[in-house]
A protein has these predicted regions:
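The feature marks proteins involved in alpha-glucan
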Residues: 3-80, 85-92, 99
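Substrate-binding/active-site clefts of carbohydrate-active enzymes
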Residues: 40, 64-73, 82-230
Length: 231
């Protein structure tokens, strides 16, 4: 246990890094930073040194107007969409956040939707999971671009009067070695009770909501997305 700190004068923006965790039995494991802002693109899974940009948001009027609405009485029409499967480039590659933004806004407005609901965008390793097996809770998936690119997407939607809802996975997480799973060799984010920590349908671990540290991690993550990305 305890709080640890490390400073590297040689670290540069976009450098990849992991934490080497030494377990009680003497073995070690390499872990991605649970609070990392940007991740390497799969199949790589290291965290990148990254400074969140001072993005030039132009959605102030939308946010002000949205805050004054009665969400119960106002009409709402939500378009749920997965960035990776909605459209692709001709070569089969995923659209970037920016390319997706430029296309989705016109479509949503033409179809008279008020909001888009994005399937999970937090970093995840397995494409067919559609984002529901998160390993980087603070990092928009790098398969579509940078955190700044995701800010562009949200801002573009808000400029057009379109709200952005983000599907958020706060129930369980996968057993990928670099992720939250048995982070220090013991159950840090999940319960140590084998009956309570296993999701039988997904073969994933369930968050232990009885721990204040876990609650803080998840609540802080929600606030982070609201404040930094305006979702």
């Amino acid at each position: 246990g305890g709080v640890y700190e490390c400073f590297s004068a040689d670290a540069k923006e976009f450098d990849a890094y992991k934490y080497r965790i030494t377990r009680r039995d003497g073995s070690s494991v390499l872990k991605s930073d649970p609070y990392g802002y940007h991740m390497c693109t799969r199949p790589e899974n290291a965290t990148k040194v990254y400074t969140l940009p001072d993005f030039d948001w132009t959605d102030r009027e939308y946010l002000k107007k949205s805050a004054g609405k009665n969400v119960i009485e106002e009409p709402i029409n939500i378009y749920e969409v997965h960035i990776g499967s909605w459209q692709k480039y001709e070569d089969g590659n995923y659209l970037s956040y920016r390319a997706f933004a430029d296309r989705i806004v016109k479509y949503v407005r033409d179809m008279h939707y008020t909001h888009i609901e994005l399937l999970p965008v937090s970093e995840y390793p397995f494409d067919p999971s559609w984002g529901y097996q998160v390993t980087g809770y603070y990092a928009p998936s790098s398969r579509y671009g940078t955190p700044e690119d995701f800010m562009y997407l949200v801002n573009k939607c808000h400029e057009a009067g379109i709200g952005v809802i983000m599907d958020w996975v706060g129930a369980h997480f996968p057993k990928d070695e670099n992720g939250l799973y048995e982070f220090d060799g013991s159950c840090c984010y999940e319960s140590s009770d084998p009956v309570m920590n296993e999701h039988p349908d997904w073969n994933t671990r369930i968050f232990d909501y009885s721990r204040n540290e876990v609650k803080s991690f998840l609540i802080s993550n929600v606030v982070y997305w609201l404040k930094k990305y305006h979702v």
